[in-house]
C-alpha cells in the first residue's frame, strides 16, 4: 500500500490533534540472590533476567478531528504499521557481585530483535555492559561502560516498489557513564 502517494498533494495545517496507542508490552522477570559462603546472612550478589514481549504492530493513531480526509489518513497509516511491523521478544540478563568491602562489579547483556515483518530487513540491537561501583551508607559512585551494536533498515522515504530504497545501517555506540548519589 502506498500511503505517501495517496496524500502527496494534500497539505494539512502544522497542528494535529490525534491520540496514539503505544505498543503493548509484557515482561517476565526472574532474579536469584546468592549469599556469601563465609557470612550466609549477607548477600554476595544476584543474577536477573527479563524476557519482554512487545507488540510493535499494535501501535495505532486515532484522529481527534472528524474531518474524513484526516480520519482516512490515520486509518491508512495504521494499515501500514500493521503490515510493516511484527511482535517481538527481547532478552536481558545481568549480574552484580559484591567484591570486597564496599566495591561491586556488574555485567549485563541484552538482545532486541527486529521489529520488521520482512525478514530481509536486518534490524536488531545487541548490548554489552559492565561496571564497578563503590557504596557507603550515605554515598555511592558508579562507573559503567556500555557498547550497543545496532543493525537497522533506514527508510528516508517509502516508494511503491520495495527493491532497494532503504539503507542497511550498522553501528556501534560506546558510552561511559558516571553516577554519584547521596542517600538521605
Regions found by a protein language model. Give the residues of each.
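Outer-membrane beta-barrel porins/channels
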Residues: 1-184
